[in-house]
Amino acid sequence: MSLDQANPNRVVLRTLPAILACFRAHPKALRELRATREAAKALQEVAAWMGAQGLPATVVGSKEVRELAEADAPAAAVTARPVLGLAKLSDFAEWREAGDTVVIADGFDDPSDLASVVRAMAAFGSRRLLLAGSSERLAFEPELWDGARGALEAVRLIRAPALGGLLKLIEPTSVVIGFSPKLGRSLAEAAPIRAPGRGNVVLLSPQGVDADLQPKVEHLIRLPAGKGDHALTAGDSAALILHWLSASGPAKPKEGTGFLARKRARKA
């Protein structure tokens, strides 16, 4: 049995990319490792480090790995994760100053879909993922961490339970951009969003923006529709959204601070 069953934030990683990413980014999260002989070679450095720390890291048969992973896997690593913090108003000021795009995942039930969002965020340098509604229950699901392929080591998970109130509080300093499969302007036709002095907040939900939250959304964008029975999921759309935002270009300078304004000021 695992030595770390009591940890409420225990996550068992079951793929080599997830285990290696944890070792590179947060090695102190590792608690126990079991690997089959076939996977052990790729995890030699991980096992050596854990052995030096007095942590169990063993080469075992597939049955013992399955016992820990609770699924067929080449290896299993028990990790201890920090308690999820609550999103605070001051956080948004810090993220805005850093130029970070914040993503809110509301109402996700499929860990593989949320994993697609995480991979897109890591690819485009977005590091803050707020979990609202049912999304919060997925935070420590092995399927999420395995599906993210190590990207969760670069993305911070934060709780956002009272989403309506939070969106109202950040309205003066943030541009909330909601995405829907049926409502809003087409993503292909939407103009780039540029708001000097305000940060971008992406609100993403598999069902589209909840009707109660729509009044708090400044821009509602319609996602591309798939053909037939092969519609894009919210996770599939995340890469399109973040690419669109990154291609929007730098914000326009505030009135009176551009090149021509400075030139006129020098002549005055």
Locations of the language-model features?
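Acidic/glycine-enriched edge-of-secondary-structure segments
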Residues: M1-R14, A76
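RNA substrate-binding interface of SAM-dependent RNA methyltransferases
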Residues: D4, L13, P17-L20, R24-K28, ...
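Short beta->alpha connector loops at strand-helix junctions that form conserved
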Residues: V60-G61, D106, A132-G133, P161, ...
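Structured adenosyl-cofactor binding patch, chiefly the S-adenosyl-L-methionine
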Residues: L20, V78, A123, F140-G150, ...
